[in-house]
Amino acid sequence: MLNTQISKSTLAKLLATENISVEYRKVQTASFDIVNRRLTLPIMNDTTPEMTDLLVGHEVGHALDTPQSYVESAKAGGSAFSTFLNVVEDARVERRMKDRYPGLRKPMAIAYRQFTERDFFGIKGQDVNAMMLIDRINLHFKLGAIAGIKFNAEEMSYVNEVEKADSFEQVKDITERLYAFCKAELDQKRQEAKEEFEKRKENGEFDDEDFGDDIFGGDDTEDYEDKNPNDYDSNGSDDGDEDFESEDQFDNGYSNTPTFEQAMPNELKVYGDEVKSVTDEKFQQALNT
């Protein structure tokens, strides 16, 4: 273990072409302190050699190419915006690292496949092509062709810009426009989903088979045939429950028709109220657990 740590520390310094400080600590993921020039690597037993090479190469890429203004821009934009900034900047620094050191290409590609197999991006069972553009861009640049990502002509223009971004100023410009594009994209997808929901609702397409009683946490109606007769008073009512004034009152309280939020496609639910890169967020969370 010690020999491996020493060799990886030496590798990091050689790649960075400067005497950066390299520390192994009980942290969950690798990180680079842009201001203090300190690379922190985790003490992990379940990572593969390729994963370690990826983490080292990735953070050294930030050491070489990411300016201190990155931190300021991320803070100013907020947490959701910072996921966009991270996706675009990651694509730039990893491309530049692989150009500098072609030997990193293979282990980085293998490592991202291994992370995907462990579902670090949170895409298992998801239709990746139904996700927001920012997430498709993230998967495209990190996983390559195996992700099977599709783009239309307008989206492809953003992909090409990310591919060619050479400076952090270009990254900021692309990120700001991409963020605005995805906000509009999410609004449009939600509107389309809502219109489809209303159409299905009018056609009576929602039934027990689609949603059932699970919406309400189970069937609240009781099988009175199985109850003890002593549980009822002389009028045949259950003292423990309030009487329903009518059958309509019962029906109105327990409709099986879902709300739009319940019927919303999973690919939209994951974004919540604010557009963000859920794949970047999931990856960071997975590294920290």
Q: Where are each of the predicted segments found?
A:
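Short, functionally important secondary-structure microenvironments
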Residues: 1-289
